[in-house]
Structures are given as structure tokens and as C-alpha cells.
Curated annotation (Swiss-Prot):
PROSITE patterns: RRM (PS50102). This is RNA-binding protein 3. It holds the Pfam family RRM_1. Coiled coil: none annotated. Keywords: Cell projection, Cytoplasm, Methylation, Nucleus, Phosphoprotein, RNA-binding, Stress response. It is found in: Nucleus; Cytoplasm; Cell projection, Dendrite. The keyword Phosphoprotein applies.
Length: 155
């Protein structure tokens, strides 16, 4: 449990900042047990955030006070306890896939209502020439393609 207490979220990283640069920058505050820069699974490029675990939780608190809002590799970084807001944000954004998708789909249907087919560019709509199902599958915001819309941006 003490390693979790000493774990910090570091956000707003320069995409070229790697684990070694993070460790070099933060090691003056105390011994570090782990440094991770989170990378995209497919491209292996940095996602702009990471985690640093200090062996002593007091060192982590010192780092948070001293480094939050400071500049690292030309970017202003955010430093916070990993268990506090970083995990809460991640849980809200990634932990409830079904709820997030439902909200997107519901929001699209409510926002456009049944008239959404009438306002599309390209001369389609009003029920002429294209079936409702075909238009729906091309929209990207309705319930039939909500998963596809999200999946395209998940990559």
C-alpha cells in the first residue's frame, strides 16, 4: 500500500519525454522505485502522461507541491497523487465504456431528433433516394454507429 501512496500522476508531458528524462528530473526529491510513461498500444508514442512511484510517500508529497505547474521539456506539467484525480479521471473516461457510449448515442438522438435526416448536406434527406437505415449507418452519431464513432477515436 505504501507504494500506491508514493505513486504520482504526471500529466501534460512533452511527447518526447521518456522514462529516463522523468527519472532524471524527479530523482533529486528522493529514491524512485518505478517510472512509467504511458504509450499508445499501436504506435508506441507517448500519450503525454505517466506515473512516478517514490519509495517514500513523503517524497511524493514534496514533489507534488514543488513540481505541479512547473515546466519540463518545454511543457507545463500537472503532478498529482495517482490514486486521487488521475485514477478518477481515467475511471470516468475509460472505465465505463458502456455508459459513455450510451451517453453519446442518447445525446446524438436527443440533439438531432427525428429531423436529423432533413438537415444533412448532400441533397439526401426528406426520405428521398436513401433509406433511413442507410442514412443512419452513415451518420456516426446515432445508435447504430455510435460504437464505430467512438472506436475510430479510441485508436
Amino acid at each position: 500500500m505504501s507504494s500506491e501512496e508514493g505513486k504520482l500522476f504526471v500529466g501534460g508531458l512533452n511527447f518526447n519525454t521518456d522514462e529516463q528524462a522523468l527519472e532524471d528530473h524527479f530523482s533529486s526529491f528522493g529514491p524512485i522505485s518505478e517510472v512509467v510513461v504511458v504509450k499508445d498500444r499501436e504506435t508506441q508514442r507517448s500519450r503525454g502522461f505517466g506515473f512516478i512511484t517514490f519509495t517514500n510517500p513523503e517524497h511524493a508529497s514534496d514533489v507534488m507541491r514543488a513540481m505541479n505547474g512547473e515546466s519540463l521539456d518545454g511543457r507545463q506539467i500537472r503532478v498529482d497523487h495517482a490514486g486521487k484525480s488521475a485514477r478518477g479521471t481515467r475511471g470516468g473516461a475509460f472505465g465505463a465504456h458502456g455508459r459513455g457510449r450510451s451517453y453519446s448515442r442518447g445525446g446524438g438522438d436527443q440533439g438531432y431528433g427525428s429531423g436529423r435526416y432533413d438537415s444533412r448536406p448532400g441533397g439526401y434527406g426528406y426520405g428521398y433516394g436513401r433509406s433511413r437505415d442507410y442514412s443512419g449507418s452513415q451518420g456516426g452519431y446515432d445508435r447504430y454507429s455510435g460504437g464505430n464513432y467512438r472506436d475510430n477515436y479510441d485508436n
